[in-house]
Curated annotation (Swiss-Prot):
Catalytic activity: ATP + H2O + cellular proteinSide 1 = ADP + phosphate + cellular proteinSide 2
Gene it is expressed from: secA
Molecular function GO labels: ATP binding; protein-exporting ATPase activity
Keywords: ATP-binding, Cell inner membrane, Cell membrane, Cytoplasm, Membrane, Nucleotide-binding, Protein transport, Thylakoid, Translocase, Translocation, Transport
Gene3D superfamilies (alphabetical): Helical scaffold and wing domains of SecA, P-loop containing nucleotide triphosphate hydrolases, SecA, preprotein cross-linking domain
Entry protein name: Protein translocase subunit SecA
Amino acid sequence: MLKLLLGDPNARKLKRYQPIVSDIQLLEEEIAPLSDDELRGRTAAFQERLANAGSLANQRPILDEILPEAFAVVREAGKRVLGMRHFDVQLIGGMVLHEGQIAEMKTGEGKTLVATLPSYLNALTGRGVHVVTVNDYLARRDAEWMGQVHRFLGLSVGLIQQDMRPEERRRNYNCDITYATNSELGFDYLRDNMAADISEVVQREFQYCVIDEVDSILIDEARTPLIISGQVERPQEKYQQAAEVANALARAAELSKDGIDPEGDYEVDEKQRSCTLTDEGFAKAEQMLGVADLFNPQDPWAHYITNALKAKELFVKDVNYIVRDGEAVIVDEFTGRVMPGRRWSDGQHQAIEAKEALAIQSETQTLASITYQNFFLLYPRLAGMTGTAKTEEVEFEKTYKLETTIVPTNRVRARQDWADQVYKTEAAKWRAVANETAEIHKNGRPVLVGTTSVEKSELLSSLLAEQEIPHNLLNAKPENVERESEIVAQAGRAGAVTIATNMAGRGTDIILGGNSDYMARLKLREVLLGRLVKPEEDHTPPVPLQRSAPGGFSDAAAPSLPRSGESLYPCPLTDDTDQALGQLARDLVKAWGDRALTVIELEERIATAAEKAPTEAPQIQALREAIARVKGEYDAVVKQEESRVREAGGLHVIGTERHESRRVDNQLRGRAGRQGDPGSTRFFLSLGDNLLRIFGGDRVAGLMNAFRVEEDMPIESGMLTRSLEGAQKKVETYYYDIRKQVFEYDEVMNNQRRAVYSERRRVLDGRALKKQVIGYGERTMGEIVEAYVNPDLPPEEWDLDQLVGKVKEFIYLLEDLTPDQVQGLGMEELKAFLQEQLRNAYDLKEGQIEQQRPGLMREAERFFILQQIDTLWREHLQAMDALRESVGLRGYGQKDPLIEYKNEGYDMFLEMMTNMRRNVIYSMFMFQPQAPKN
């Protein structure tokens, strides 16, 4: 009703951008005739104008003013360098991002290209722009691919990758535009705030940030904080014993009601992801361990047993983690990717290692941490893009103060979303998925099946193998991850079948008929690998499509394949081209050396050759011509295949379970029907799926009994669909509340973190260190007076002996101070007198130390302040964690846990800062440098 009265707010926003789009089109005609150098000259002119404006506040209005011309310049550069012209809707997307909003753009609408517009505009200030992606591969791809536009226009482009050294990172952060992943940015921020010297700091001040797949980073990952930790020794045998106890205990069939324990040793609440021992379970565990009390502070066991039970019940192998090279490696539940190097905290990872009988690694202690929510709020202007933001609009608005604008698609969507099919049992569902896949495959259409775990993808793989259907498997198993882009490059070919966990949803578009450009690059990689790459480099050859054994990994020939050629390539190359490639390989060996490159170096050179940017290097030129030649031959076949696939109905996407979030379902659907292509989607569900089991409740159980249908009969019911959507909304609200709680609690830490980090940065910059330490001393003297002097008592009753004794403890240089000297002074006079004494003593100390070596006093000041900040902050983080754990129980006493946490946390913080000041003063006066030996 409101929409009818007031009009659609989104449409109103879009209308506002229309005149600017017209301005850009007019400017385009003026800019098109410019030479490359003249086009680059525009960048220099913009930069000069902004440099004269000075502060960021003065630059903002100028940025808005030059936006139409800057966007027209980028549009022209895109045409010249990439052969891609920004559509009008992409210009609108760029404006939405420049204003610091979230642009919702459907899959295949060219979000990556949109980001070039606001990145270029905001980089002109010289303050740096960060473009954030979800993984290293996408960051590298975007920096290489879109970076060409920026480099062509005279801006520098940086890239941050996981294994870079600090000096490389600093160089890349100092570029005008830096591509990085969210985790690298966050960890660099934390490491910078642990640096012992300003030369170790790699980032500069934040200015503007564009996040690709913003929902994945700001929402899906918002529950897990970034943590840098140090190792703590804990007895390993405790984890092993706890795992044995957990295995011997029996799970209760139901949860406790009205405080009465169910039958069994422990209960599992899957919704809250928690395990709790019953009274019977406590008794059994204590008996097995031979202890009187699991909670004994001298020999605590409760924590180990709880973690072991969680490892047994809630952390499932090949779903939550995989075992690789003797280690338990986490699998990201949203993307399905493995996260090597990341570990669950609080002893949980060790419990999983004990369960799997792996070597148990040391437990860790938090040295620094921050949530993504608070990290990204450090940027003065933040923007993001995604295909699916509207479902989380409220959260973006409330947590990040980010508006969402839906950008219209360039072409009308032609995708058909077919009704869900729900089966009574899981086995029936998987049979139906395999049958539909086989049916669509026979019609010559490509199929993408999305699964929720490694285990499920392998189950479907074996079902398809039974029907002898060739397919590719894409999941977090290491042998498949390497081939992700190769598999996706051919997922749109006629009759191709691809099974993927959630990981395949991001970054690489599925092109109908296959991606001839990428296949040409792979062909060159295959030809050159053996000749140019070091033999010990572990490289995997491209993966062909003909795979039909269980797991999709044998080379058995498929019976009915609409394919030419035996490999992943659309057709064999002509003899002439084959010979030309052989000659190219020989020429490159002469130029670059026999097997002298790494795989990554070779791939980077092929990627550079595949770009359109001008190059002087003759070898890159030759590579470029070879790629074009191979692509030309493939194109003929791919174009025919594309029209066959279009006529057959395009890509069909099958979902095999509703995800907890509607957004992830929409991302999977969005793989089909990109840019107006034909396509279709369908979800297959069973009443045993996690979502329905955990959140669907009794209503669905009732339905199961009501439907007296055959196993293989699908159920389609409006009531069931509503139940499903209700369950998803319930889950989304539940997780939103958790994220909100994480945010509210971390907000308390955030204010403290900012105070500590800004104090630390002041010290690193070496600004007025002496003044800072004297300030600490003056406050300490004031605190000593307040501790030993009661203004309500007459001065003759003040305990001046103890007061003077305490002052001498801190400042041994005042050993001649006596109570008589301070007799008769009022409270404020006493403070002023002692502060004056402190300043004199400090000058004396400085004189002594500077005699040893000039500048030593400043070094000592910096060392002691940093040492105290780091040690006490680390202890404070642990204390705050413990407070957070215990404060929850106060809800039972009718107190708000968050308010209790804020108040006590604030008191603890003040105490920490007081201790830091006192320890620094004490250390500075006690500092006795050794005289250098001659």
